[in-house]
């Protein structure tokens, strides 16, 4: 979603929220939470508050009028009823064949509510220097995590990675073969954005940056001489990220056509642009997701930009066997997150088994 549209959506949600959620929002801006995270949390709060009113737990006529003491006095049984509502709600939708929302969605909802409750019961201060209330019902609510070993998760992910020669084969496919299947009209659209699309894919495969980090790149953040980019990580921290040299020609070719192709002026500082009716704009995350999905599906298997991040991490670990180096490249504070890649690159284990 474009930053401008994202901020508009956030304002729409803020306009209907109770005062204590607005307090929470303002506090988390100072952390800072990303606008994307806050937007997702506000969506979850609306869903929760709608349920409070519909279920009769709150007699407020609208979300903005929900009182703080409603949250204070919610019971564990109330929260379990809400979780059950989430599981059953899609079955009420005649257009859905699913029996309930995924556990991942439920966990995301509960995570958003836990953050709000922690703020209200621990972090905020009233006039007396005390939190608004002390009873945190979310501490009594258990989340159910998907049961899957790292080895199982690694095997599932491995099928969606472009490892070894496939990294360059994917880029070559988009560069030289993809358009051969297109109609003249589709080919014209592809050729307009070809250099940009290749540059985006190459950057993701060569750096492992998150989708949001690529979207928010500005011209000043990219140093092609040193092959280093400056990104804003989760939590608002700035970080320097090395980029593999194979991405350089793709980035250079894009920069050669960027200004003329996308009608960019000096004030258009976004690195990756779109152009509509002569007006350049920063490309949004959904456009990149669709683009990566389209090309990858035609090449081998439909993947997300995050799988390209996994591809870089796996290739880097395979080359270095260093979880520390991989965690630094990805912007993780701990090597625990990179344990997954040791299971994807498990040739030594398989070779040992073959010798038995």
From Swiss-Prot:
PROSITE patterns: CB, TYR_RECOMBINASE. Residues 16-121 form the Core-binding (CB) domain. The active site is at 210, 234, 306, 309, 332, 341 (o-(3'-phospho-dna)-tyrosine intermediate). Pfam families: Phage_int_SAM_1, Phage_integrase. SUPFAM superfamilies: DNA breaking-rejoining enzymes. Residues 169-354 form the Tyr recombinase domain. FtsK is required for recombination. GO terms for biological process: cell division; chromosome segregation; DNA recombination. GO terms for molecular function: DNA binding; tyrosine-based site-specific recombinase activity. GO terms for cellular component: cytoplasm. It comes from the Bacteria. It is found in: Cytoplasm. Belongs to the 'phage' integrase family. XerS subfamily. PANTHER family: PHAGE INTEGRASE-RELATED, TYROSINE RECOMBINASE XERC. Site-specific tyrosine recombinase, which acts by catalyzing the cutting and rejoining of the recombining DNA molecules. Essential to convert dimers of the bacterial chromosome into monomers to permit their segregation at cell division. This is Tyrosine recombinase XerS. It comes from Streptococcus uberis (strain ATCC BAA-854 / 0140J). The gene is xerS.
């Amino acid at each position: 979603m474009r930053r401008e549209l994202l901020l508009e959506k956030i304002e729409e949600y803020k306009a209907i929220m109770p005062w204590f959620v607005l307090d929470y929002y303002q506090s988390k801006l100072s952390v800072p939470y990303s606008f994307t995270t806050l937007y997702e949390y506000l969506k979850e709060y609306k869903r929760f508050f709608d349920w409070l009113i519909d279920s009769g737990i709150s007699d407020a006529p609208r979300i903005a009028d929900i009182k703080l003491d409603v949250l204070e006095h919610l019971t564990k049984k109330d929260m379990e009823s809400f979780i059950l509502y989430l599981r059953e709600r899609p079955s009420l939708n005649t257009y859905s064949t699913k029996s309930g929302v995924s556990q991942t969605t439920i966990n995301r909802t509960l995570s958003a509510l836990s953050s709000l409750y922690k703020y209200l019961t621990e972090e905020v201060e009233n006039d007396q220097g005390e939190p608004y209330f002390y009873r945190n019902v979310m501490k009594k609510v258990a989340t159910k995590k998907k049961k899957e070993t790292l080895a199982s998760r690694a095997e599932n992910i491995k099928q969606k990675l472009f490892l070894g020669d496939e990294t360059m084969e994917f880029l070559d496919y988009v560069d030289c073969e993809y358009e051969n299947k297109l109609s003249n009209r589709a080919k014209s659209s592809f050729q307009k954005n070809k250099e940009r699309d290749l540059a985006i894919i190459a950057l993701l495969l060569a750096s492992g940056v998150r989708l949001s980090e690529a979207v928010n790149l500005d011209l000043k953040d990219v140093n092609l001489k040193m092959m280093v980019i400056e990104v804003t990580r989760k939590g608002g921290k700035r970080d320097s990220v090395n980029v593999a040299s194979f991405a350089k020609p793709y980035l250079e070719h894009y920069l050669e056509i960027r200004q003329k192709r996308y009608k960019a002026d000096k004030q258009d500082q976004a690195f990756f642009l779109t152009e509509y009716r002569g007006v350049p704009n920063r490309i949004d995350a959904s456009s990149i997701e669709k683009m990566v999905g389209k090309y990858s599906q035609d090449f081998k298997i439909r993947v997300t930009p995050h799988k390209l991040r996994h591809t870089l991490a796996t290739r880097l670990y395979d080359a270095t066997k260093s979880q520390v180096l991989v965690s630094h490249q990805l912007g993780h504070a701990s090597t625990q997150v990179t344990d997954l890649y040791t299971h994807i690159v498990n040739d030594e284990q398989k070779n040992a088994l073959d010798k038995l």
